[in-house]
Amino acid sequence: MQAEAYVELTARYETPLFSYSARMLGGLRDGERCLIAALTAGWTELEGGGAEPARPQEWFTALVRERCFDELARRGAVSAEDDLAGTGDCVALAADAALATLRPAYRDLLLLRDVHGLDPALLCAVTDMSEADAENQLYRARAEFAAAFAALPAPDRCPLRRTDCPDCAERERLRTQPAHALLHLGPLEVRDQVRSALRAALGSGS
């Protein structure tokens, strides 16, 4: 596989991979750096031109996931940084803030299963868990997220006056159904610079 073909392959999966890494690490720029580093390491693992991975989604997700956990082990706890604040409505802002309070293992499972919709088989393959273990951990993760979301104070960065904001009203309603707040976490846009940086790291001039 040539470097440009590898970049094109990563482009099929870059949006969910970036969205995952940014939310795992609590910031867009950290997410970008992690994604580039993980994909560059993947190219090295393929020995700079090996065959395409047999299961690309599983392979890329595992690469980025491992890189995120390595970064978290070095850095410690995360917070939902200001650059995530403009990526969604007031419900999404609150969901991001609640996710940031969770232990990484729980945040990981919620992002993979409830936000990005990995099916149970793929989730188990990526996390190296049995289906029973994954379901048990997801149950605990959802409960912890629910408690964190319900306990959050009213947002202070609403673009409207909170009394006039339908998203804030929805956020208050979801205090009783906090799992639904995760549905507000949409995909995060990948900047063109990310792909350019990956090409540079791989030595591809295209």
Provide a role label for each language-model segment.
Residues 1-19, 29, 43:
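A short, charge-rich alpha-helical start-of-domain segment used by transcription regulators
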Residues 11, 113-115:
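Short amphipathic helical patch at the helix-1/turn junction of helix-turn-helix
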Residues 14, 22, 32-47, 52-89, ...:
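Σ70-family region 2.3-2.4 aromatic/basic alpha-helix that recognizes the −10 promoter
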Residues 94-103, 125:
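Short amphipathic alpha-helical boundary/capping segments
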Residues 109-110:
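A short pre-motif secondary-structure segment
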Residues 127-156:
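DNA-recognition helix of helix-turn-helix
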Residues 153-206:
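Hydrophobic topogenic segments
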